[in-house]
Amino acid sequence: MCIRDSIYITGCNYVDSLSYYENCSFAIAYFEKLIAYGKEKNIKIATYNCRWNNFVCNAEAYKIIHGYLKDLYIKYDTSHCINAGGDYLQETRDWGKRFIHVHLKGAVKIEGKVYDNPPAGMDQTDWTSFMGILYGLGYDGGLSIEPESAYWHGELSDRGVDYTIRYFRNMMI
């Protein structure tokens, strides 16, 4: 949750027995209700771009669902896009104005396969370009470090978080 804002972050399951059109239509109806309720409570609604139990997580879905719902935001994590083979810089360029919260988690792929999510700044993500695009779009929301590595545990994980803090401090303007 952002310090300045109350945000409810959610996804939307895909129903295999329905068409993509039907899934999008039901998702829009669902999010419309959440947005209306959120406005009553001063809470902004955001989708997350993780693919687990959620189909509203890529440029195609954003174009339809977020394109229609102007008050639906995005909690963004570059690693989810990278690990799914997407273009996180393109998604940021096209949808970054709707990003309300950002996770900082590294992503490393080897031979086209997900290897690990090491500390942000020790990975393959072009963080300077990502942050440059975000700042250029006026982003001033939260940045949350999300340690989620198969290899970085305990004290090593703590040192990785410290590294990420130092790494991103140099990009804060």
PLM-predicted stretches and their roles:
Residues R4-Y73, N83:
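Active-site acidic/histidine proton-transfer and metal-coordination neighborhood
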Residues D5, A36, V56-Y76, I82-I173:
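Histidine-acidic metal/acid-base catalytic patches
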